[in-house]
Amino acid sequence: MENKRPLILVSNDDGIMAKGISELIKFLRPLGEIVVMAPDAPRSGSGCALTVTQPVHYQLLKKDVGLTVYKCSGTPTDCIKLARNQILDRKPDLVVGGINHGDNSATNVHYSGTMGIVIEGCLNGIPSIGFSICDHAPGADFDAAGPYVRRIAAMVLEKGLPPLTCLNVNFPNTQEIKGVRICEQAKGHWSGEWQACPRRDDANFYWLTGEFIDHEPENEKNDHWALANGYVAITPTVVDMTAYHFMDELKSWEL
């Protein structure tokens, strides 16, 4: 029986035209057969959102040896569901999201369409990784990230990941990466999130903006600190959001 190369399903939330996904494809191609299903336009901040009020459609853009590329009208999570159920003839060996223009460290993970991709893969029992870089520029430089992307993806293909566990990988905005840190998710919140954007007869328009406030800025174990100090931050992330430590106390309330 012929051994098949690993099947790697790729998506992003910045859209099919983003540089980050092109670079990700380039980094991953030596590792297996690549199928890309990415949004046809930017879908940043969509989290795990699904399209439920209208049909979703896709279009084949490219079919080459070892690489097939589609675009989709839906969300990043739609992309994974659609590819898994309508396009692929076998279960992927790996789902990869990114490379996102902008980091997904700390509480950003809850808003991230990149991590929505990863969570969807994880829920389907597929080892999944999200890659992001601390640079929002359309022309961001991903060269320093490349070797780490390949190494991390290769290790996950070889070793797998525990059930309901995925990897959130963030790169600092530097060409002189100091190394890798295995991190916890930084605790924090966003402040001053809305900036007025007045229109001619209506001032009720706002841009989402803001500043991230790290609740533990000196905590060298968290991802926010690692990125600020030039390290790749890898955070093992679980999909099960049950607060097990609170269950017994909640039972004692006798609700």
Curated annotation (Swiss-Prot):
A cellular-component GO term for this protein: cytoplasm
Q: Which family does the record claim for this protein?
A: Belongs to the SurE nucleotidase family.
A Gene Ontology molecular function term of the record: 3'-nucleotidase activity
Q: What class of enzyme is it?
A: hydrolase
EC assignment: the record states 3.1.3.5
Q: Where are the transmembrane segments?
A: none
* Keyword check for Metal-binding: yes
Q: Which cysteines are joined by disulfide bonds?
A: none
- Residue span of the signal peptide, if any? none
Q: Which Pfam families match?
A: SurE
Where a divalent metal cation binds, per the record, is at: 13-14, 44, 100
Species this chain originates from: Bacteroides fragilis (strain ATCC 25285 / DSM 2151 / CCUG 4856 / JCM 11019 / LMG 10263 / NCTC 9343 / Onslow / VPI 2553 / EN-2)
Gene giving rise to this polypeptide: surE
Q: Which reaction does it catalyse?
A: a ribonucleoside 5'-phosphate + H2O = a ribonucleoside + phosphate
Q: Which cofactor does it need?
A: a divalent metal cation
Q: Which UniProt keywords apply?
A: Cytoplasm, Hydrolase, Metal-binding, Nucleotide-binding
Cofactor comment in the record? Binds 1 divalent metal cation per subunit.
| Function according to Swiss-Prot or TrEMBL | Nucleotidase that shows phosphatase activity on nucleoside 5'-monophosphates.
- Where in or outside the cell? Cytoplasm
Protein's UniProt name: 5'-nucleotidase SurE
The UniProt entry lists the main location of this chain as cytoplasm
